[in-house]
């Protein structure tokens, strides 16, 4: 069920700050009939960028970035047309510390969606805090 329909979700200011955005991002959260697990969807209007990347270029940038990160917690799914996938399901990664990112794109419309599937309780604030501490102290994952 969707909520935050006023488009004033409490996390918008931090999304804007950390992503260094000049405008508020569009965020429309929803909840379902499950105890944990989450899909975050980030819509991108690529045509608003100075240089418009293709979906493949966007995918390659994310895949290259996460391939070099120790620990391998984040996986970027193979790029291609996906109409439906059993893996794009909120509970798919429950009980893990993993995240899977999907890049869905329509190059003709210069639009893309980034989808991230993860266990919001296992990958929640406490897990993120430990990973941030490790980064700050120069420790491994």
PLM features per residue range, with description:
Residues 98-141:
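NAD(P)-dependent Rossmann-like dehydrogenase/reductase catalytic/cofactor-binding core
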Residues 1-114:
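C-terminal substrate-binding/catalytic lobe of Rossmann-fold NAD(P)-dependent oxidoreductases
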